[in-house]
């Protein structure tokens, strides 16, 4: 007789990383002719087996359970020991759940079948509850991902709009400041030029007044000298009066013409110098304005490139969001398929439970019949 009767171990996924798995029992389930699995009950306990199980502290563990216990000891995972009933011990940790049956379990002959049924129901309910918990957690994760994506999209759109508005305001303020500075510089240069022109004009008028005063003074002195020597040289002057007047007139005109030419040349030179200075200042101002304009245009081009890059990044983010939306759709379809699979597993479990109950009833009737026939034979022999 096999010393390991009906040991069943269920591994649960405590970290919720995958579907829970069932470890096979030492007794394989033979196939029914209809294609379904037929549960195998433990064989009846004989006297020899009771004599072998006389020690109360021993527990029957399959080789697979020994390997699992060695793995748990090596990984040093914390385990929880639950005493379900006398002779029925449940050991649970993060990786698996193991069940140990002792001698006290085999002493209960009358309640053996009901205990087996309760174990099977317990394991099935554990599997169903684990699947339901996994589905609930998956739904919560999907909802959290949807909320995170919506909040991230809103934050990115707000940040992009804020950056665009800041850049536009900065460009407008800089262009306004440059226009104001340029206008102020032009006004300042015009005022300086007007003031310089007024000063030069006043200086020229002052020089002209001074020269006219000198000319009048010389003319008056000449008339006084002429009057003083008029009597002495009247005869000479009478003879040479015409020549002298003519020469005087020509000389005066010549002197006036020379002075006029000299003043005109001097004024032309000064005006040319002023024009050169004015042209140089205007060219310098125009060069500065051109450089500032080029810098502004270059900065405007850079701002346009930055705006284009931001638009590209926005398109990339929108593409990523669309990809994540497709992933969410696939997750929803997988969730729907898992729900359908869970319903199908529930129906299969209910059918297996019904089949197990019928087989158990048949086995009980057969066992009663097998007990009844020897008792009748014993009664007949006694009689």
Curated annotation (Swiss-Prot):
Q: What does the entry list under GO cellular component?
A: cytoplasm; cytoplasmic vesicle; outer dense fiber; sperm fibrous sheath; sperm flagellum
Q: Which residues carry this modification: N6-acetyllysine?
A: 354
Q: Say if the entry is tagged with keyword rRNA-binding.
A: no
Q: Where is this region: Disordered?
A: 26-79
List the keywords (alphabetical).
Acetylation, Cell projection, Cilium, Coiled coil, Cytoplasm, Flagellum
**Which residues, by range, are in coiled-coil regions?**
125-220, 276-359
Identification of the protein by name: Flagellum-associated coiled-coil domain-containing protein 1
